[in-house]
Regions:
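A short, N-terminal "cap"/entry segment at the start of jelly-roll beta-barrel domains
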Residues: 1-38, 140-148
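Double-stranded beta-helix
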Residues: 99-148
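Non-heme Fe(II) oxygenase catalytic core, chiefly the N-lobe of the double-stranded beta-helix
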Residues: 5-7, 48, 132-137
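Conserved metal-binding segment of the jelly-roll/cupin
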Residues: 46-49, 84-105, 113-115
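A short beta-strand-loop-beta hairpin characteristic of the jelly-roll/cupin
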Residues: 56, 60-86, 96
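Short histidine-centered beta-strand/loop micro-motifs
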Residues: 29-35, 52-57, 74, 81-83, ...
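Conserved short histidine dyad/triad with adjacent acidic residue
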Residues: 20-30, 40-57
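Conserved hydrophobic/aromatic positions in well-ordered beta-strands
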Residues: 42-44, 63, 111
Length: 148
């Protein structure tokens, strides 16, 4: 699993870094093409109702629905929502809290494009960090998932 929230029920998913390392909290996650300049590309597959929880980045993130229907929420508490259908695109600004989940009834894919050559780590919403700690997971000083 690539991310702290993917250790929590409802947020399990598969990530495939294609170009560049993207953002990951698992040091074993390696991209197909390591070299990336100015952008990173990742595919994600999620079951119905699952996907990344509320988080932000200090770089631009673009979501492109490839299959299925996706809910994208944003705002400090995820209070805004829009639905993406195949090939719909949304760009989430730097620092904006966002989450995305499969809103369909079967497994679905979406594509993420991250701006920058070396995108920064994920900034999780406080409730995600607390839920992960309650489940026995933290991030170490290097930003990697550790079980406690």
């Amino acid at each position: 699993r690539f991310f702290l929230d993917s250790m929590l029920p409802g947020h399990e998913r598969l990530n495939y870094n294609v170009i560049g390392s993207g953002v990951s909290e698992n040091p074993d996650a390696k991209p197909a093409i390591e070299y990336a300049e100015d952008f990173n590309l990742t595919y994600m597959k999620a079951a119905p109702g699952k996907g990344p929880s509320l988080h932000s980045h200090d770089h631009i993130e673009v979501f492109i629905a490839m299959t299925g229907r996706w809910s994208v929420t944003w705002g400090e508490e995820g209070q805004h929502e829009i639905f993406l259908e195949p090939f719909d695109v949304i760009s989430v600004p730097v620092g904006e809290m966002r989450a995305i989940r499969n809103a369909g009834d079967s497994d679905a894919w979406h594509l993420m494009i991250l701006g920058g050559t070396n995108p920064s780590r994920v900034e999780w919403h406080d409730n995600v960090i607390q839920r992960a700690q309650d489940a026995g997971f933290v991030l170490d000083e290097d930003g990697n998932i550790q079980e406690v």
